């Protein structure tokens, strides 16, 4: 069988989490992929079959808390001929681990696909240089939803015509970072079309600090909501004399992200650099 027809070896970090468990299920349901590792810090479940833990039946893949050891094992799938057809890491862990996990994965020659948000602009620049040096396809994807990519493109197009805009993102109350990486990415795309927003006509005074949200250097304001019952929601509102223009996207189930996740896993091995954003893969 040619390497092009072989299943892609994948390990999942955060395999017991809300997103990670969905990825494990999606990987298991497709013949295009082979689950070779499951990583999570739940010590009480370490060594147990991830399939049994997630109700999938035994998969002969056992949960480990050893991130680097799992990468080392997966790196055995790295081809010796220099081609970028090795294993892929899908990471949905915690913002404080995102940078380290990405860099370590690249160092082991395992293609990182990072859905964990919280990577700073400086860290992104460093990781981009590191991936370039390694000539290893790597991906940092703030949001895997095709619908969100379409919203971002529409928002960027609208920014050419509106000088006033504010963004609101809403997530479940177990999300650690605010604003979300998706919201920041949307703001960045909008700012590529216009550098200054929301010039003030009055001297604003907040009676409760933070009432007006966080303001970026461009003047764009970002607002975050955290409540149980939410999954992921974003609204971009533009305003002008006599009208508002609103764009919104709502994720009601995490299965909506899986087509994007699987697409990136399939395509990232054909890259030799770091890509940021799903729109660079589509």
From Swiss-Prot:
- Which PANTHER family does the record cross-reference, listed alphabetically? 4-HYDROXY-TETRAHYDRODIPICOLINATE REDUCTASE 1, CHLOROPLASTIC-RELATED, DIHYDRODIPICOLINATE REDUCTASE
Summarize where NAD(+) binds, as residue positions. Answer: 14-19, 115-117
- Could you tell me what this protein is called? 4-hydroxy-tetrahydrodipicolinate reductase
Compartment(s) where it occurs, according to its Swiss-Prot or TrEMBL record: Cytoplasm
Q: Which GO terms describe its biological process?
A: diaminopimelate biosynthetic process; lysine biosynthetic process via diaminopimelate
Which pathway does this chain act in?
A: Amino-acid biosynthesis; L-lysine biosynthesis via DAP pathway; (S)-tetrahydrodipicolinate from L-aspartate: step 4/4
Q: List the Gene3D superfamilies.
A: Dihydrodipicolinate Reductase, domain 2, NAD(P)-binding Rossmann-like Domain
| Species in which this protein is naturally found | Prochlorococcus marinus (strain NATL2A)
Q: Which UniProt keywords apply?
A: Amino-acid biosynthesis, Cytoplasm, Diaminopimelate biosynthesis, Lysine biosynthesis, NAD, NADP, Oxidoreductase
Molecular function terms, GO-annotated: 4-hydroxy-tetrahydrodipicolinate reductase; NAD binding; NADP binding; oxidoreductase activity, acting on CH or CH2 groups, NAD or NADP as acceptor
User: Any idea which positions bind (S)-2,3,4,5-tetrahydrodipicolinate?
Assistant: 172, 181-182
